[in-house]
Amino acid sequence: MVTVTQGVKVTSTCAACGGVLVRDLGQFIDRDQLHWGIEGRCQACPNAWCETDAGPAPQEIRQALLAEHGTTRLRLATEEDSLVPVLRALREMHHLSLGEARLSADELSGAGMVGTSVEMAHLAEGLRKRSVATTLASSPA
């Protein structure tokens, strides 16, 4: 089982009092599923909350993680004799049509797929379970 987490703190103005609102935004893998979470707390008033869910992160979280940590590129490590295991993994993990999975497989075979480190580690693990070797490379923010 893969354990990967990534987070970032961001500040904004509290809607309740105008104070400084500190939010911890994150993405993680739990029990082989992609998850995201937000914890927020105002430094001046009792306004606080926590929200988490399974699945792809909302764009606000993705963009904050990419801006802070940069991107991770996932590629197939070798030219596959058959893309069937790659297509199966992509269809299962991302609920893609066969055509969409083929486009994603072409991307993985070529320049690679880019996302957060957690997203790419999750996909790499799904491919590994189908005996597909991959490489991950990080690019700084």
Model-derived segments and spans:
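Short, amphipathic alpha-helical interaction segments embedded in low-complexity terminal/linker regions
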Residues: 10, 18-19, 23-141
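Structure-specific DNA junction-binding interface
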Residues: 1-7, 12, 20
